[in-house]
């Protein structure tokens, strides 16, 4: 038992220079945990509430001093004296204290900071690395890194409609080999773009963000880069997309403003089908808007045996929305973001529910990140087999990739790379 002795929050900056919450939690046995809270750019409407101050004269309204105050003045007195290692009891206490369905009083950024800090303090108290503390001895699978090497959408001033173009290096024996391949493709892509006279400035997540004439142009350049780097598209490296379609969906018209025109859901489904016939795409995230349950069910039924459809804005790491998706057959993969739901406990519950019902899980960063590496340990602890944490650039992204290298080394001969098996719905490339 590690009794919480003190909890203190402060305002710090994330990778985009926006304020976020840091929580320091100390226990009676000398352990200390640090909780650093990420923040998204394209967010689902059903996500837990991120508390911002709204004072336009300070950080353009994005300050989090009220969330900090909530930790120091409301949450801290309530949790001091509790067992930090009883994560469920701690998280439920904060949820009850908040008293709203979406953490809309205290703020998910306040609650998550404490939840994460308690998790780290408990792991230190138990003298265990975080992945071992969460997953026990069963956590041993290193995830496929889905690397966002070209940015569009809300991450890059809408250089393209599609928000993320990722490479998924699954055709390798170890995580370190896969990471090397991904990095080499990333650097090769820079040269490919330069030769075309295109800008190689970076988006929020470290990917290149040139203006493109079409979404397919980005895919073609990535295919060229994979081959030029000496790898086989499909066989060794697949492509994953985050369409983030809620960002260009018009609620009033019920249409998607895509490639310069307003499109019906049926057009979008046909577009995706043609895309996966033309390119080695193994995963599509948010192909439809966050309340388009019927459209999600239709694409999953039609194409779900060929690739994974990942629910981000649709499911928001929320066990209740995930249960609805399972019931309707909408999506077959869960994107896991700790700050979407706001506690460690609810995040773990969502992963377990997904696994139990045959969904894959992809543990994810946010576009506004910190040096925190929780998601790396979480992916290994729960054997999710997939992680997405941006391009192999920018320190806050590299920290996650480096943490996985450390874990792989620590696990030694027991480490297993998820590889192609991570994408359960995809069969055609490995069979060829």
Swiss-Prot record:
Pathway: Carbohydrate degradation; glycolysis; pyruvate from D-glyceraldehyde 3-phosphate: step 4/5. It comes from Bifidobacterium adolescentis (strain ATCC 15703 / DSM 20083 / NCTC 11814 / E194a). InterPro entries: Enolase, Enolase-like_C_sf, Enolase-like_N, Enolase_C, Enolase_CS, Enolase_N. Binds a second Mg(2+) ion via substrate during catalysis. It holds the Pfam family Enolase_N. Belongs to the enolase family. Keywords: Cytoplasm, Glycolysis, Lyase, Magnesium, Metal-binding, Secreted. This is Enolase. It is an enzyme of class 4 (lyase). The active site is at residues 205, 337. NCBIfam families: eno. It is found in: Cytoplasm; Secreted; Cell surface.
């Amino acid at each position: 038992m590690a009794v919480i002795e003190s909890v203190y929050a402060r305002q710090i900056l994330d990778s985009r220079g926006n304020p976020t919450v840091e929580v320091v939690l100390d226990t009676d046995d000398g352990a200390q945990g640090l909780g650093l809270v990420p923040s998204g750019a394209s967010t689902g409407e059903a996500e837990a509430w991120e508390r911002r101050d709204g004072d336009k004269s300070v950080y353009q309204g994005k300050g989090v001093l009220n969330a900090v105050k909530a930790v120091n003045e409301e949450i801290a007195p309530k949790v001091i004296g509790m067992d930090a290692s009883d994560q469920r009891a701690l998280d439920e206490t904060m949820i009850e204290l908040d008293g709203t369905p979406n953490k809309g009083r205290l703020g998910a950024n306040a609650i998550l900071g404490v939840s994460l800090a308690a998790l780290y303090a408990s792991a230190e108290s138990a003298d265990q690395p975080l992945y071992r503390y969460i997953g026990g001895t069963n956590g041993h699978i290193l995830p496929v890194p889905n690397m966002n090497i070209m940015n569009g959408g809300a991450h890059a001033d809408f250089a393209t409609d599609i928000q993320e173009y990722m490479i998924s290096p699954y055709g390798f024996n170890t995580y370190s080999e896969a990471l090397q391949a991904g990095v080499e493709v990333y650097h090769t892509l820079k040269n490919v773009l330069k030769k075309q006279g295109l800008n190689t400035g970076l988006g929020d997540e470290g990917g290149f963000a040139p203006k493109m004439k079409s979404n397919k142009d980005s895919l073609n350049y990535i295919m060229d880069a994979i081959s030029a780097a000496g790898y086989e598209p499909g066989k060794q490296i697949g492509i994953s997309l985050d369409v983030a379609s809620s960002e260009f969906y018009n609620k009033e018209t019920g249409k998607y403003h895509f490639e310069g025109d307003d499109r019906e859901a049926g057009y979008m489904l046909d577009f995706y089908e043609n895309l996966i016939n033309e390119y080695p795409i193994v995963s599509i995230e948010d192909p439809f808007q966050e309340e388009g349950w019927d459209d999600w069910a239709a694409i999953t039924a039609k194409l779900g045996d060929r690739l994974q459809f990942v629910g981000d804005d649709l499911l928001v790491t929320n066990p209740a929305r995930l249960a609805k998706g399972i019931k309707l057959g909408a999506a077959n993969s869960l994107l896991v973001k700790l700050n979407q739901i706001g506690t460690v406990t609810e995040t773990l519950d969502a992963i377990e529910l997904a696994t139990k019902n045959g969904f894959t899980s992809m543990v994810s960063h946010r576009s506004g990140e910190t040096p925190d590496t929780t998601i790396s340990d979480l992916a290994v602890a729960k054997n999710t087999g997939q992680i997405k944490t941006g391009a192999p650039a920018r320190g806050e992204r590299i920290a996650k990739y480096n943490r996985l290298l450390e874990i792989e080394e620590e696990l030694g001969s027991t480490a297993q790379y998820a590889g192609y098996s991570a994408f359960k719905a995809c069969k055609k490339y490995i069979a060829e």
